[in-house]
Amino acid sequence: MAKPTKKTGSKKTKRNVPNGVAHIQSTFNNTIVSIADTAGEVIAWSSAGASGFKGARKGTPFAAQTAAEAAARRALEQGMRQIEVLVRGPGSGRETAIRALQVAGLEITLIRDVTPLPHNGCRRPKRRRV
């Protein structure tokens, strides 16, 4: 009979990363917060869906705040102190996510809006009639 082999999972090493970049992608349906180091390697991430919200509640400002707090907590464990914030998208959770990062203890050095704007590219979706 074959002996059971012991599987060792990948160990996450605790790195000391003092500063980095927080990418906040805020759509109408969800908010995703990724915190990376200066080389671009993601240290921590969270989203409204990963924070336990489902359906239409993922697009709320409170869900964005919860996601940003969770990502900031993980980044602080890795030793991050200063971040630049790059915001993308038209969602309602943009400002609350930035405020949540600040309240969590991260010092924000720069806020930049990097929402992609088409130079008359694809046709827009039709208007909703409610």
Swiss-Prot record:
GO annotations of cellular component type: ribonucleoprotein complex; ribosome
Signal peptide: none
GO biological process assignments: translation
KW Transferase (keyword) present: no
Keywords from the UniProt entry: Ribonucleoprotein, Ribosomal protein, RNA-binding, rRNA-binding
Molecular function terms, GO-annotated: rRNA binding; structural constituent of ribosome
Pfam families attached to this UniProt entry: Ribosomal_S11
Cell cycle listed as a keyword: no
Function statement: Located on the platform of the 30S subunit, it bridges several disparate RNA helices of the 16S rRNA. Forms part of the Shine-Dalgarno cleft in the 70S ribosome.
Family indicated by similarity: Belongs to the universal ribosomal protein uS11 family.
NCBIfam families attached to this UniProt entry: PRK05309.1 (NF003698), uS11_bact (TIGR03632)
HAMAP family, alphabetized: Ribosomal_uS11
Quaternary organization: Part of the 30S ribosomal subunit. Interacts with proteins S7 and S18. Binds to IF-3.
Protein name as catalogued: Small ribosomal subunit protein uS11
Gene coding for it: rpsK
